[in-house]
């Protein structure tokens, strides 16, 4: 998809999700937007585009609405396997988003209302059994960071980032020291892991990437 198409999808679905989250009393919705992006492939999957199910919601035993049988992949511990299953069908995106919140409005997912941030929301989803993918939490968090989706959360996002450092710095260690943050290798690794998905090897490229975010005031705290 083009950058403009990605932006258009987020601008369309995010306000719908935020409005429904407000109605239901959820502060965090960035992870839900990320779910719509990942599960529905930016609204282009058949399930999302035709059936307005952006979240891969299966019917289960309690669903009494319309359904469609489709192929899907699941990870039961030995890698992805292809299966067929019945999925919920909605008439429009508003119903689809409301359906997601209906789905999580059970005792099983009760902890989601108390998630402090997008990462904890993703961790709760995985722990509650929403998805089988081992990388589900990382995938969602990477998506939130990539598209700055945390700006849609009902939280003080300014407290999520380190303050800007001087633009003249060429060393991440010196930059962290300047703003009074622990610059040890162990803490830098924690910082990197929150902001990037690859393994931190203390390379010059990785340190430069962290420094660039810090200069912009966009380096997330661990």
Predicted regions and their residues:
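A generic alpha-helix surface/boundary motif
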Residues: 14-15, 119, 169-174, 185-186
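Short alpha-helix boundary/capping elements
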Residues: 40-42, 180, 218
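Short, Lys/Arg-enriched alpha-helical microdomains
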Residues: 187-219
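Extracytoplasmic/periplasm-facing segments of secreted or lipoprotein envelope proteins
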Residues: 160-183
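Catalytic cores of secreted/periplasmic lytic hydrolases that degrade extracellular macromolecules
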Residues: 1-160
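Small-residue-enriched hydrophobic alpha-helices in membranes
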Residues: 158-163, 216-222
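Short coil/loop linkers at secondary-structure junctions
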Residues: 27, 131, 150, 182, ...
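Residues at alpha-helix termini
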Residues: 24, 128, 147, 179, ...
């Amino acid at each position: 998809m083009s950058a403009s198409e990605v932006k258009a999808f987020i601008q369309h679905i995010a306000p719908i999700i935020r409005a429904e989250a407000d109605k239901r009393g959820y502060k965090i919705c960035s992870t839900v937007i990320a779910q719509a992006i990942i599960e529905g492939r930016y609204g282009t999957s058949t399930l999302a585009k035709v059936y307005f199910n952006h979240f891969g919601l299966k019917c289960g035993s309690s669903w009494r609405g319309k359904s469609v049988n489709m192929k899907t992949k699941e990870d039961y511990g030995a890698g992805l396997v292809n299966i067929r299953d019945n999925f919920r069908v909605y008439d429009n995106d508003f119903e689809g988003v409301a359906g997601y919140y209906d789905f999580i409005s059970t005792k099983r997912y009760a902890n989601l209302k108390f998630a402090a941030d997008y990462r904890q929301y993703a961790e709760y989803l995985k722990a509650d059994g929403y998805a089988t993918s081992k990388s589900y939490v990382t995938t969602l968090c990477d998506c939130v960071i990539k598209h700055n989706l945390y700006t849609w959360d009902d939280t003080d996002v300014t407290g999520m980032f380190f303050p800007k450092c001087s633009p003249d710095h060429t060393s991440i260690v010196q930059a962290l020291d300047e703003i009074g943050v622990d610059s040890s290798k162990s803490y830098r690794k924690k910082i990197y892991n929150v902001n990037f998905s690859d393994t931190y090897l203390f390379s010059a490229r990785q340190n430069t990437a962290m420094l660039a975010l810090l200069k912009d005031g966009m380096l997330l705290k661990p």
